[in-house]
Amino acid sequence: MAREPGVFAISVVAEMVAMPAQNLRVYERHGLLEPDRTSGGTRRYSRADVERLHRIRELLAEGLNLAGIAHVLALEAEVDRLRTECARLRRR
C-alpha cells in the first residue's frame, strides 16, 4: 500500500498532537518518525505520521522511554504485516 504524501508543516502537526515541535524532531532523530521532505528540506507530515505521534504520546503516558516505544512500534508494524500476509494466504 502506497504511503500518503506529507502535507502538514511541523508547526501544524505540533499543534494537532499537542506537543512541542522540538519533540517531533527528537522522535525523528530516534527513528520513531520519518516525515517526508520538500526539495528544500522542509518536513511534511502525513495523516499516518499524525496517528503515529498520537500512539507515541500514548506510550509515553504509559511510562515507556523512546527505546521502548521504538520496540513497541516495530512489533505493532510486524503484527500488521503478518495479519496482511495471513489474509492474503487465506484468499488463495
Model regions: which residues?
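Basic helix-turn-helix/winged-helix DNA-binding cores
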Residues: 1-61
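Long, leucine- and charge-enriched amphipathic alpha-helices
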Residues: 59-92
